């Protein structure tokens, strides 16, 4: 690893090299000097090291080595060179250097040597006479005529400029500023002198800065004076046989290490090889110079922490490279510090630039690869001469022998030992290990060495003894005693100047680690040295170092959990315990881990000695270990005897204890297990009056009801009736089950095996109960990870070794293998995961605890368990009817599938009967299968439980945070889409946290005062939370009265705060949350339940602490924050109210008043009613998730009052609020707020203090005493006992809130209430606060205070409302409208309805509240007051007429069953129905998101029908003003014909009218088709609501294609090809039904199709439908929509005063419709039978009849005189018997064709609107060319057929050829057509176009403010009112991403 530049060791060398380079380069031109800057790069460049080719002069003796034996003679020239090389290079040596040089180079080198020698002699002379004083910087600058820089260095400068690099960076710009043209060489010299002077004047001489300065000053001196050759002071005479150990002069961690490859090359000999080509980086860019010294320091520290093996790793790499005979040339890069040891220039000869350059082997030139001519792509192999040398004829020559020897000498001197001490990471004289690269200071060894040892020396690492095995984990560490010190001799070799003096030579203490060995038990734990751990478990050691404090050993951890006092007493009494505690327990080893739980298996070794596989208590199976027979472990012999006894019991005599072990076992013979009888000895149908003998033997006593349960279970078993034991929680279902299984075993009925599946958290409790109540059972707990389960399968399932294949993968068990266990305990998950093994065993009985896991027959658990081979099933559940009857049926279906297998039949039985009857019927049905007892039935004298809701105030700090959260999230709350559901949930969670405690927010936690031990200051902790203030008072009284408390919270962080609170108050406590696992959990429960336990409180998380825990010793439960799911809270407080409880249980549920918590409590209660009152399939809420509306409602609760406090506070201070207080209606449940308002009203004005106090809850001593009074009446549950206490209404403590008089009452069985929503609530409430906050933020960010514009937000919202009202398409019908919206509904334009209600009626309707969303009346479900029959009638009406029109309430659309409903109720139900229709989700779901039953509603079919009816209605309205109302106008009375078209449209109450909030004038006769289409579009806005997805998707575009089609008629014949091409394009655009035959696309070639739709439509953005010019053109164009014959006919009739008729469907020729019309009209016109032959006219009136009478009401349409024309074509068939059937079939078939054409027309319109085009090169376009070819061929040979018929044989032959050609062309076309669907461009789904999900599009649609696209175009729309109404932004109204599929049935 390279260190940064500028370290102390490198600076002298670095500086000297710079100066020498300066000398060499000063002879060259100035351009070459730029390379100097690169010797001081700002950040190191890590590049491969190369051995320099040319030797440079030595600058420093620093890197010099101690000489070996033969190195002490006087130095020859070669040796001198060698020394110089080793000195100057340090660790730069690399084996990749060249071994041979050219002759010329050799000569040059010799000359240089002589010069150097001469210079060296001069320097020696100087040495003798003393050194000359170097010139000062002032002298130098004066000498060179430069301006000196006068800068006075401050004390700070001496502190900061601690190295040469920093100094240079600081001073160089100052010098350059005064002397802009100073040469680089002079700059460097001046800087060196300045640095020397700066260092000499440094007042901090002892600091590292001074040391660095001295080093560089020394380097500066070497510019002119070379140092004398350093000879090692410790020279040993050559004759001595004993050599000293190897030493070296290390350079510290900042220096590169030498490469190891030298040794390898030496070993291999000097065979020829291709030398590496030299590369060099010159002129490194200046950008790299800007880094600070911080980076250098960071790299230094990185180096210190780097892997200790880095040098050897690098060396190995180098060695590997050296082994190749031929190697590629390596690119040589510049080194950071040492510079480049060659004479080559560091810039390109051609471009004079630096970079990666290739060096010539025969001259100093260098080149870029790209600058050579020709250019080289890569470096050439071998030696390379540059173009200049080749031109001159200079060639490379090998070196002669003496130079090779010189190279060899270098190699011998090469060393790969570390350059720094391994202990202190510092340089200096180092002792090198002979076996590894490690180096050490003598004083760093432990114990330190006084002198260098003789002979070979091995470091501590090489002499470290190996470990006895693999370490599994580190348990503890400690300091050892230091080794005895050596007698300190003379100090070691001299250290560098500036280094601290060596430490005294005394040993230092080392760490020792207490470790657990892998594969060995905790009995074998032992201590190991730190070095052993570091060497053999490096990663584990480093991880431990990182996670633990390595200065102080960890405190002793008594794993047993005993308190110090108890353990001291026990140690005094029990010396064995004291010994174990000292050896094991204090290091965190639990006593249980050293106790044998069970012996699993045995084996014999080669000597015949026996070994046992032992499972240890409280440790998983993968920690099992093999132990020898003679080990001294308590109770080992007893367990061995039990092991052999169990083998004998299960396998018989063969499995006895081996004979040689019998003696040891004799004395334990009496403990042998009793064998169960082979045949039954007791009749299971006979009742036990008292508990049987085998239960007495356990020492336990069953309660009478438990004995009754045992009798019932045994009887059911005998009868073969599978059962559900459904006793209420806390009545001991576990004990009854275990005793039942034990009775089967002990009485000889069954030997097992039994499978028990239970929640993972309760399995420990099951184990304990089995141990207590069934001691003879061999119970195996099958849980844990893969390794543990693998051990269990191999050792616990069978006695045979090969019964199951080993390994982690699960395999089946062999058949007829003896099972080892009696009972297998496992979790739900493993039932499914390890199905292979568990499913292969035949189980005598299955027990499923918490069996409501089986309520869904689609769950994997249900399906897998159903496949097991089970003789008898027993299910345990405390909540058998948790949700609904369907779930109960699934339980019964699992039990007895042969009896309960028809879900529909089962549910029908319970469909229409009242709740009481359902209960009775259920009782009869479940009688044989289910036993359920309640605590109230069983324990008549069991203390009752009382639950109180305790409302708590927010503290001031909480209020601040509550407001802040709401204000900060204003945008999310106020987003017009209602906000993202996830973001609303996040806001709610933040508010819940705030209600609990503000310290749950990191900001508050950081600011909170903290004690020295890290816990929060108690007083501020309490004051910050209203709940804690109350809790403090309550706990004080509860403690004084001797009660014990359970405190539940959902949040584990809240439990942390409660811990701090209890510590502050001085209460002892226990805690369980999700992170505390089985063993620790049970210990905590045992400690709390122990007699005389000191623990006063038990902190539990609601979910983790709610299952399988018995804490009956506590009698007070405080639910600190309610859970989302009320069942979890019930489970929680049932921990205390259970068997063993002898005191009354008080349950206090803390609820923060007027906050989200209070609202959540109400919603949770309502949800509970929903899931339990409704015993009806599909109504149970499957998901506990809140709807977005519920979330919004919860968030609003109490906010009005909270923010009103601010305003009142300002009023009391005489201030005026800046914004008016919005009049926000109080949400339901806000009775408290209402009460507070009343109180305000009665308060005298000005008495604000009293006003404030009146609405705040105060808890004084009297209130607390009353709250804790246990003589209050128990919660009255008697009325609700039918549903087993699930609806126990919460009793609200009336005294808590002073104003509250009454208790909440349940009026009727309201399951769910739909609530009105004010969409502008957040706008009114938070806008001002939000803007204020944004302003504060801006000011704090330094942007200055802005002047706020005064805005009246009420005005703004009214303005918004005005323009939104014009866009009724965007108003939300998905939630019930507010009062204002209701008024919009009622204020209808005059004349639209003949039955207008009076104002009084409307007002009474409006004031009457809506029925609840879900309610139960007489056993039946009502949705918004609609019963099942009415809901069915409404659906039928939708399927008949499509969307209800605006005036549906006053038309025949309102069928008889719906006429009893008020208009408000009807509209509310329409809104709800449409919301459900637009709700994404599977049709298979039982309910919608809000819990309303689906009742088999198929969203697909309903949307399809609505869409088709909408298209039909729109098409009829398009032509209605032209065609009138009557199909046969000559038969119509005169009065009817004279009506205005507008009246004609609306006069029939059954025909839906165009509805718009603003009154529209009736369409005049001249209105364009497009305008009509737009008016038709508004038809879908009935009842102020959006159309659902289908109709939205179908009716988006104007009918511009109709007009375009008319224009087509005027195209000249030569444009026919273009028309065909466009038609083909339309084929590709169309999104029509895949069912329609594709071949029809090419048939109607005479049919006009749209040509260039883009011309008429333009881009959608530029489309302006109400442009007056367009309107002028359109009436004429409208008449061109028909065919030519039709046009002519229409004109003729118009002139003669006859009626006009106009009708067309622009299907683009994709259906047969126009072909049929042409043929039919030709026949009708030619025969004159306009009425009798069915054609276009009849199709129009068929559609008009469908609009009036509904879908497929053929008979009604035929009987209507308005549509008499439809009967005319069939008059001739009237005498036939199947006349009606034939007529209806024809109408149905014809309507299907029209349907298809309408859909295609709509799709074409949309394609044109979106400007969809097909690439002309697309293969599909080839179809057009083929068609032209076919037509051309056919037309040009038409005459042939006549000639052929006339007998012309040549013509006949030609005709045959032509026909063959046509056939081939047509077959090719057919092949192309089959490929079309996959190639055509499709209109992407709306969701894809908008890049929004279906749900988010729906959110936009359901919001009043509309989506952003509307808002963006609002200004344009204000100018065009018609466009506003009829053209809402198209994409956002197409929420159905599967639009194409929905059109398929047509």
Curated annotation (Swiss-Prot):
InterPro entries: CHD_C2 (IPR012957), CHD_II_SANT-like (IPR009462), CHD_N (IPR012958), Chromo-like_dom_sf (IPR016197), Chromo/chromo_shadow_dom (IPR000953), Chromo_domain (IPR023780), DEXHc_CHD5 (IPR028727), DNA/RNA_helicase_DEAH_CS (IPR002464). GO terms for molecular function: ATP binding; ATP hydrolysis activity; DNA binding; helicase activity; histone binding; histone deacetylase binding; histone H3K27me3 reader activity; zinc ion binding. ATP binds at residues 727-734. Residues 1030-1195 form the Helicase C-terminal domain. Its EC number is 3.6.4.-. GO terms for biological process: cerebral cortex neuron differentiation; chromatin remodeling; negative regulation of cell population proliferation; negative regulation of transcription by RNA polymerase II; positive regulation of signal transduction by p53 class mediator; regulation of cell differentiation; sperm DNA condensation. The keyword Membrane does not apply. A motif (DEAH box) lies at residues 849-852. Keywords: ATP-binding, Chromatin regulator, Chromosome, Differentiation, DNA-binding, Hydrolase, Metal-binding, Methylation, Neurogenesis, Nucleotide-binding, Nucleus, Phosphoprotein, Repeat, Spermatogenesis, Transcription, Transcription regulation, Tumor suppressor, Zinc, Zinc-finger. Residues 345-655 are annotated as: Histone-binding. It holds the Pfam family CHDCT2. Methylated at Gln-1392 by N6AMT1. Changing residue 346 to A: No effect on interaction with histone H3 unmethylated at 'Lys-4'. No significant effect on the ability to repress target genes expression. No effect on regulation of cell proliferation. It catalyses: ATP + H2O = ADP + phosphate + H(+). The keyword DNA-binding applies. It is found in: Nucleus; Chromosome. It is an enzyme of class 3 (hydrolase). Residues 1551-1564 have a biased composition (Pro residues). ATP-dependent chromatin-remodeling factor that binds DNA through histones and regulates gene transcription. May specifically recognize and bind trimethylated 'Lys-27' (H3K27me3) and non-methylated 'Lys-4' of histone H3. Acts as a component of the histone deacetylase NuRD complex which participates in the remodeling of chromatin. Plays a role in the development of the nervous system by activating the expression of genes promoting neuron terminal differentiation. This is Chromodomain-helicase-DNA-binding protein 5. It comes from Mus musculus (Mouse). The lineage of its organism: Eukaryota, Metazoa, Chordata, Craniata, Vertebrata.
